Amino acid sequence: LAGIRGKEIAMIFQNPGASLNPVFRVGDQLLEAMRLHLREPARSLRERVVEILGRVGIPSAATRARDYPHQFSGGMAQRVMIGIGISCVPSLLIADEPSTALDVTIQAQVLALLRSLARELGVAVLLVSHDLGIISQMCHRVLVMYAGRIVEEADVATIFRAPAHPYTRGLIDCLPRTEGSARLGTIAGVMPGLRSIPSGCPFHPRCPLAEPRCAEEEPKLRSAGDHHSAACLLVGT
């Protein structure tokens, strides 16, 4: 795994303040993975650090590389995290809620940066998010998870236009609408703990369409259309 982690697969965490080491300069933290995976002279790697910081939008990159994490704003710290993630040009970049702690304006800038860098470098991005707005903007294909299990998979347009799983429908119904005066949708009940997942379909205690068999039979992913599947006993019936 040591040869894969950071080189073939890299990760951006949701809280840069907790992910960056407060006692090391950001440039040294960028260097860490490159020293391990890239066979280049030290001087070349340090030049690459400055180049990466500039690429992710850090002004005065050569100077800021010598600064510590507490000297960066939340948005700039997240840009540093993106720089660390792309430093070895991985095949897969996992972004775990990369904009959670940011205000809306900075969030849009960081996501636009992530999208443009992924396209420019040819890196696949696995985005973990609970924000359907971000998912609609960033993703091509979506996997919906509930209680640790995949309950639906489809391209992003299908997920929003024709969701097949009741949980996915419930999530989309919770989105605020600009037209009309209908009450905001909610999903009844609470998410089960991973040590107390219900038998059968894990969503059945909260599902408005649940049948008796839903409490007994665990559904597997089944076809709900072209390149579309859902783990629901009612799909295809």
Predicted regions mapped to residue ranges:
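Short catalytic/signature loops enriched in Gly
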Residues: 59-65, 153-237
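Conserved ABC ATPase signature
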Residues: 67-72, 76
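ABC-type ATPase nucleotide-binding domains, specifically the catalytic core motifs of the NBD
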Residues: 1, 25-44, 54-59, 71, ...
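A short, proline-enriched helix->beta-strand linker immediately N-terminal to the Walker B motif
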Residues: 87-91
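P-loop NTP-binding/switch modules centered on Walker-like glycine-rich loops
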Residues: 2, 94-98, 102-182
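ABC ATPase NBD coupling module
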Residues: 1-10, 28, 36, 157-163, ...
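Hydrophobic anchor residue at the start of the ABC signature
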Residues: 30, 82, 106, 110
